[in-house]
Amino acid sequence: MNFPSELKYSKDHEWVRVEGQTAYVGITDFAQKELGDIVYLDVTSVGQTIDKEAIFGTIEAVKTVSDLFMPVSGEVLEFNAELESAPELVNSDPYGKGWIVKVTLANASDLDALLDAAAYTTLVGA
């Protein structure tokens, strides 16, 4: 499994990539493998401010539907529109084209509570 060192990770299997005051959020390689083939994402929180650890949408796989938890507090600026027609990007490129939302980073200290790649690897037993 792949866990890029430049990202931060939540215990709920989301990742965060920070670019200035903006953060991209997606699910980890571990999460997409556990879920299986992703068939649909439902994110209706664009324009809303979501608290850290609150649900910002759902992800549907062939086997199950799971909640998506916000790893940092912030306003959801954008949903990755490519996922509407190609949700499988979450499986094939979870850290690149498969990002799910872009948010404003309300509190940079939220990042301090997240895991680095080594700690996340330990969490998932990889």
From Swiss-Prot:
CC cofactor: (R)-lipoate
CDD domains named among the record's database cross-references: GCS_H
Residue ranges annotated for the Lipoyl-binding domain, each copy included: 22-104
One cellular component term from this protein's GO annotations in UniProt: cytosol
Pfam family, one: GCV_H
GO BP annotations, alphabetical order: glycine decarboxylation via glycine cleavage system
Positions carrying N6-lipoyllysine: 63
Domain of life: Bacteria
InterPro entries on file: 2-oxoA_DH_lipoyl-BS (IPR003016), Biotin_lipoyl (IPR000089), GCV_H (IPR002930), GCV_H/Fam206 (IPR033753), GCV_H_sub (IPR017453), Single_hybrid_motif (IPR011053)
UniProt keyword list: Lipoyl
Cofactor note: Binds 1 lipoyl cofactor covalently.
Subunit architecture: The glycine cleavage system is composed of four proteins: P, T, L and H.
Family classification: Belongs to the GcvH family.
Role summary: The glycine cleavage system catalyzes the degradation of glycine. The H protein shuttles the methylamine group of glycine from the P protein to the T protein.
Protein name per the record: Glycine cleavage system H protein
